[in-house]
Amino acid sequence: MAKIKVKNPVVEIDGDEMTRIIWEWIRERLILPYLDVDLKYYDLSVEKRDETSDQITIDAANAIKEYGVGVKCATITPDEARVEEFGLKKMWKSPNGTIRNILGGVVFREPIVIKNVPRLVPGWTDPIVVGRHAFGDQYKATDFKVPGAGTLTMKWVGTNGEELEYEVFEFPSAGVAMGMYNLDESIRDFAKASFNYGLNRGWPVYLSTKNTILKAYDGRFKDLFQEVFDAEFADKFKAAGIVYEHRLIDDMVASALKWSGKFVWACKNYDGDVQSDTVAQGFGSLGLMTSVLLSPDGKTVEAEAAHGTVTRHYRQHQQGKATSTNPIASIFAWTQGLSFRGKFDDTPDVVKFAETLEQVCIKTVEGGAMTKDLALLIGPDQAWMTTEQFFEAIRVNLEAEMAKWA
């Protein structure tokens, strides 16, 4: 069959270690045999970032901004040991953080559900997407130890000289205190990105807060979400047959455990930090978790696996030993990016190809072929394959599926 034409370019961001090896296999064996796609390639290996003083990361982020879609391989965020290992000029910042700061938007983590991989929460038969508002609150707070008895006040001075002052607490003795903040604009952007993600998936959106206690602070999140929804999304949601609701965080946590999935959970910063890990563990494996960064306007997206570079396996690979590394989340980084590309470009065949490759991955595992991490979740009697064998199984199954298109 003729290759499927991808109308607009996709930014491809390469990474490090074991995931870098798998990344190349995905591109060469699963993507390029079927798609005619213009890939704008950026090498974000730690060596390249060091060589360019991290300029390559900034260039890659700006390219995603220009073309609208990026797919990213896992990368090393250097610590002291890595600086020494690679002889780096300095301890470069997380590429994900740099890209996120340039693109803005919200990170949505979505699990890949495979029937025969047991879940800690068996009722979760469909994905639960957690969107985390990665700005402000505890993560930008000023906190300190209060040395002894005294009065804690909070003061705001406007640029026009207007002042607001609140007495927070009369300390009878030593303790701790904290002041934190958020911005209306950031909350609105968070709302837009969350609603756009829900629309894209065709799933309902729930915002969780504790507005009964933090009436002004969390109340602002609730009010701004409602405002954005009513003004820009109510009609679109109605047409798509989905809903938006605000829930109290305690009620939402309980509901999430009861429900089967297929919803987007918009979380404040701290809640998102905690609940995204709860959800990941509940679904069984970080090796089956994708991460999608979506801009507020819903027009710029970057997809990647939610796991790291699998250093332990890379060390085995360097010694010439076969590994059993799970490529599924990295494959889904490609498919999620391509799916958005197809939707943006209005090219249904590209979307269909992405969905086909995803189904092939799931069906391959459900058919009993898998890597060691998944086999261990199933039980001691489950056979597993090397990375190469599993990859070949996916390639063969994809070939068979694509032959049906002719």
Swiss-Prot record:
Its cofactor is Mg(2+); Mn(2+). Mn(2+) binds at residues 250, 273, 277. Binds 1 Mg(2+) or Mn(2+) ion per subunit. One of its GO terms (molecular function) is isocitrate dehydrogenase (NADP+) activity. It catalyses: D-threo-isocitrate + NADP(+) = 2-oxoglutarate + CO2 + NADPH. It comes from the Bacteria. NADP(+) binds at residues 72, 75, 77, 82, 308-310, 313, 326. InterPro entries: IsoCit/isopropylmalate_DH_CS, Isocitrate_DH_NADP, IsoPropMal-DH-like_dom. SMART domains: Iso_dh. Keywords: Glyoxylate bypass, Magnesium, Manganese, Metal-binding, NADP, Oxidoreductase, Tricarboxylic acid cycle. The record marks 139, 210 as: Critical for catalysis. Homodimer. Belongs to the isocitrate and isopropylmalate dehydrogenases family. Catalyzes the oxidative decarboxylation of isocitrate to 2-oxoglutarate and carbon dioxide with the concomitant reduction of NADP(+). This is Isocitrate dehydrogenase [NADP].
